[in-house]
Amino acid sequence: MAKSAQVPLQFWLPDSMEGPTPISALIHAATMVTAGIYMVARLSPLYELTDGVLIFILYVGSITAFFLGLVALVQNDIKRIIAYSTISQLGYMTAALGASLYSLAMFHLITHAFFKALLFLCAGSIIIKCHHEQDIRKIGGLRKYMPITYLAFMYASLSLIGFPITSGFYSKESIIDAIGYFGHTIPYLMLLLSIFTTTLYTSKIFFKVFFGESTLPKEEQNDNPKNENDRQMLLPLFVLTAPSVFLGLFIYDPLMIGILFQNSLAANELMTVSYTHLRAHETSLHLVCRLLLE
């Protein structure tokens, strides 16, 4: 709970975002804070022997996903909003672990690493552009000055909210559907509500930063529309955008239908025939997307 910043031990993670943005992207979004998720998944045979602990994990994850999404809504520091978003997404993974959906937890861990790292790096690009200003109430109108960062942030945001075809759609919706299917009504409803909070705080950042009015001093506003940040800052955005959008599409089969984790995780009900029928509608969408790309 502490390592993956779950309620009530989540307070350390937003404060750790005071460091450099690349550190936030690499460690706090993709690796370090997910160690707790990996540990529970790796020890899944042991946790399967303790039903009470699994139910506790399920409710902790659901509460974290919803509660921290609400906290993100009232933040104005761009990095803190993304930090609370990270905790909320870790709640999805924790809830999946509590429902014995270990493959789905690892699925979301993988997809989340890419689009959340992209969001952090886009935030860093924005902060540099705005002379280290992080308050989104003072930042605005960057769409015409930072077109590459704008597009990268948009794709990462779509994946975060679970827009169809993006990586986040496959991993998040799979977790929510599976938890609802197996009868966990209260966690299911909390995760559904967290979708709305995720959409709200993501839209808050996106439209305020790229379409709002800037209140920065005139000497800090850059009126040159061609002045994007250096190539060294833009290259990682290109690298992370593709997996943020398409990764879920290509690893859906080995994780959801295949047996990638059969020797390491105690995956049980995920591959039942009844659950396969439940997922038929999403599998059909998955096949349509594959055909469109091919």
Describe every region a protein language model picked out.
Residues V288-E294:
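Hydrophobic alpha-helical segments, chiefly the membrane-spanning helices
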Residues L237, L285-L287:
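Generic leucine side-chain signal with a strong bias for well-ordered alpha-helical environments
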Residues K226-L278:
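Hard-cation-handling environments
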Residues V40, L287-V288:
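Hydrophobic packing residues within well-ordered alpha-helices of enzyme cores
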Residues M1-Q232, T241-P243, L249:
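Hydrophobic transmembrane alpha-helices and their helix-loop junctions in integral membrane proteins
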